[in-house]
Amino acid sequence: MIGSGFVRAFAIVVVMLVCIDSSAKGGVDLEAKMREYGLVDIATVDSTIMVDLKYAETDNFVGSNMYGTLRKAFFRPEIARALAAVQRELKRTDKHLSLIIYDAARPQSAQQRMWDKVKDTPNRRYVAKPHRGGHHNFGIAVDVSIVRDGVPIDMGSAFDSFSDVSHIDNESGLLRRKLITREALNNRQLLRRLMRAQGFTTYRREWWHFQQYDINYARRHFRLLDF
């Protein structure tokens, strides 16, 4: 027979786990909110695209899980379709290659936590201010790279590396200074070529970031993920 002390201890552990999970996602069912706001799970459009949401882990620049149990990448439907088209073309290039998504639609609450982390540091230039929302906060941006047989290919720097090596506006200089390899440059160019062909634009400080729509247009016409 299980003693009452064991039962009490087990109950405490369960309550702690529930609190941790609730704290991580602010008590909000993020997947349900994404759907409520009209976004779609990329896996329902193309299940071959890999997803590894870095802000659903603790190994990120904030140092905490900001997405709780959310593991799916959500976008506006037209963005998801464009990514599926990129994936098809990438597979035509080499069947062993695949897109991998590191971040997708991002709640405004997560944007606030990111901003709070960097606002008093030089790294604030890498993070959009949360009060009006950036492209991620409207479901129209993606942080993405390429894997070969499930292994990330060389892009010259890690995702979310806050350094000039992540910038794309002077890659010839990075190559000349041997800060990136020719292979890494070729890989970046492949990703950019495929993404641009589907209407995505780049952000000069992050090789992994792509977006669609002017941000002012998005603020007028799309719903901010204000949760």
Which residues make up each language-model segment?
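Segments that shape or occlude catalytic/ligand-binding pockets
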Residues: P107
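Conserved metal-phosphate-binding beta-hairpin within the catalytic cores
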Residues: F210
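Extracytoplasmic cell-surface/polysaccharide-interacting catalytic and binding patches
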Residues: S23-A104, M114-R205, D214-F227
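Bacterial N-terminal signal peptides that target proteins for export
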Residues: M1-F10
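Short, well-ordered surface patches within globular domains
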Residues: A110
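Bacterial N-terminal signal peptides
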Residues: A9-V18
